């Protein structure tokens, strides 16, 4: 695990990883997954490892030119320029809360966050079949199904400046393939893309402990609904960078669960 963390740390969550580094990371992920095969992610002894706050540390996606499985358009080439990523989180919490969060600085100056909050459940066999879509990879009994609410986009780190609700609801799957005290490894339900999540960086007293909790203040605020007025405010904030993509599409893409 230490070797895996050492390899992924300088890769900007996988975006800048070379083909050689990506191959080394993939081999380590495969080895850890194989060592954990047959384990029950929902067993009592694993609850403390599964249900906690996590930083998205790595996404095994070969190209992030237009979008990334963790962060959607925010983490595409243009998105990374406009919305400079400060932090990226995914939390699976008891009793049934799942949260994806990207914290950014608009044009490197204005802090903000995009938050997807939803409800998780253990995916049934029928649900796993639906979540696979066209993937050839079978999903295990450790798969989580998440029903996400409409995305919330907040300006000011906790939404104090402006909070908007933009985009549709969504349903996604995430197959848990490895757990230990430091990390969680999962595969996207429909893509099979590997994700590495770090819990040690979000634990109480760790560098990202406070930031990983700020999503709660964002979702507690009453957002403006999607409307012409909201879009006008949105554009005034400098976010209308969508000559090639409708505004709501930037916030409709689930993060780290594709």
What do these predicted ranges mean?
Residues 1-258:
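Soluble ligand-binding/transfer domains with enclosed cavities or grooves
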